């Protein structure tokens, strides 16, 4: 089931996130992060009123999703960039898809216009999952990162939502 993240979920989130760092190009980071890092991340998300949701079964966090500001400048305030991570032992069970759909629903409910996903161009599974729910490729930055002895291309996918009825510049 999906629910809002609680502080006591952070140890399991840490494990999922560090697996993505160490074993994939889903995160362009080299070293595992600490629990203190995830606590600071959690507090920052709360301060920014950004959601963190988790998929939990039998008190085990199997995946999580979040979004945050796409860029810090005010004219971007209707655009968010999201992340979805699933524990490797629970992939292929539809958890990522459910988390993705829920984070989109939350963005829509908050009046967002655009949801962005930055996806490593070689991550075909994630790209297909995003396309399946309506994301379209909006561009690729070639050689955006370097990890595991090779240059990485970062593809951006976007989903356009209805957005606010009366957008403002403030």
Regions from the PLM with identified roles:
Residues 69, 116-119, 131, 136-153, ...:
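Conserved catalytic-core motifs of GNAT/GCN5-like acyltransferases
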Residues 1-13:
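A short beta-loop-alpha structural element at the N-terminal edge
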Residues 107-119:
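Conserved GNAT acetyl-CoA-binding A-motif
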Residues 10, 14-43:
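Conserved GNAT-fold acetyl-CoA-binding loop/helix
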Residues 163-170:
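Acidic/histidine-enriched, glycine/proline-rich intrinsically disordered or flexible terminal extensions
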Residues 86, 92-105, 124, 128-132:
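Conserved acetyl-CoA-binding loop-helix of GNAT-fold acetyltransferases
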